Swiss-Prot record:
UniProt GO MF annotations: chitin binding; chitinase activity; endochitinase activity
Keywords per UniProt: Carbohydrate metabolism, Chitin degradation, Chitin-binding, Disulfide bond, Glycosidase, Hydrolase, Plant defense, Polysaccharide degradation, Signal
Gene source species: Oryza sativa subsp. japonica
Entry EC number(s): 3.2.1.14
Catalytic activity entry: Random endo-hydrolysis of N-acetyl-beta-D-glucosaminide (1->4)-beta-linkages in chitin and chitodextrins
Protein name: Chitinase 9
The keyword Phosphoprotein is assigned to this record: no
Role, per record: May play a role in defense against fungal pathogens containing chitin.
InterPro entries referenced in this protein's UniProt entry, alphabetically: Chitin-bd_1, Chitin-binding_1_CS, Endochitinase-like_sf, Glyco_hydro_19, Glyco_hydro_19_cat, Lysozyme-like_dom_sf
Disulfide cysteine pairs (residue numbers): 26-41, 35-47, 38-65, 40-54, 58-62, 107-169, 181-189, 288-320
Amino acid sequence: MKATTTAVALLVAAAAMAAQVVAEQCGSQAGGALCPNCLCCSSYGWCGSTSDYCGDGCQSQCDGCGGGGGGGGGGGGGGGGGGGAVEAVVSKELFEQLLLHRNDAACPARGFYTYDALVTAAAAFPDFAATGDDEARKREVAAFLGQTSHETTGGWATAPDGPYSWGYCFKEEIGATASYCVPSAEWPCAPDKKYFGRGPIQLSYNYNYGPAGEAIGEDLLNNPELVASDPVVSFKTALWFWMTPQSPKPSCHDVITGQWTPSSGDIAAGRVPGYGVITNIINGGLECGFGPDDRVANRIGFYQRYCDVLGIGYGSNLDCYDQRPFNSGLTAAQ
C-alpha cells in the first residue's frame, strides 16, 4: 500500500516473461540427484512432500530420510519445525510461480525475497502452515502471501501475466520522510531512526518494531534497517505479525485456520471468520467499513490467484466492506 500507490505506474518492458524454463531437480531426469531436506522425488523429477511426489512413481526418499521425514502432506495440526511445514505446502518452483515477477528488473526488491529465507524464517514459527489438514495449510500460505503481496505489489491493471503476478516487488516504503515514531516508554524510538514500512507486511511504527524485534531476537528499535536488509529477519517480522494476536484483534493465523471464534461484539460489527477479517486486522482503519474499496479488492485478487495455483477453494467472507474496524492498536501498513 505505501509501496502500492507508488508502484501503480510502474512500467516495464516485457523482458521477464512468464516462460519459466526450470530444469528437473532429481531422479533419472537429473542424473540420479536426490532432493534436499529429505523431500520425495516425483516420477517427473520434481521435489516435494505431498502424495503427488511421494506416491505412485516416486523415485527416491519416498518415506523421507530414514523415517520421520518426508511424508505425504496433510494430516492433523501440530508444528512443522525447521520450516518443513512451508516446504510441504510450497516447493521452490511453486514459490517462483506464485511470486512470478518479484525479481523483475523494475522491482526494487529484486533478489531479496528468497524461498530459502521464507523457509528459514518459518522455522521460528512452527505452527505456520502446519495447522489443520492439507487444504487448511495451503489456505494459510495463500492468505499470507495474498496479504503481503498486496503490501509489496508492483503490479498494475495491464501488467504482464496480470496484476496479481507482481507481489513482493518492494521491500520498503518509497519516499518515506516521517519517522513513524510514537512516544512510548516501553518501545522508545532510537535517535535518528525511522520506522516506516518495511518487509512483506510493511511493518511500521516503533510500537511494532519493538515487540517484533523482541520476539525474533533482534534489536529492531536501534536497527530497523534490518527489516529491509536481511531477508530472514524481514520474513520473520511478517510472520510475527501474522501469528501474534493484538487485543482486541485475533491473530491472522487463528482466523485463517478456523481457530478464532468471534465475540458477540465482533458479530455485531460484521466481523465474521474469513479472509476479510485479516484485512481488517492489518489495515481495517483505512480500508474496512466504507463499502467497496480497490485496496481490499486487490488483496482478494492476490489471494484468489494463489488459491487457484494451489488448487483450493477461497472460503467465505473475503472482503471487509461492511465490517467495522477493530479498535485502534496495531497498524502494520498504511
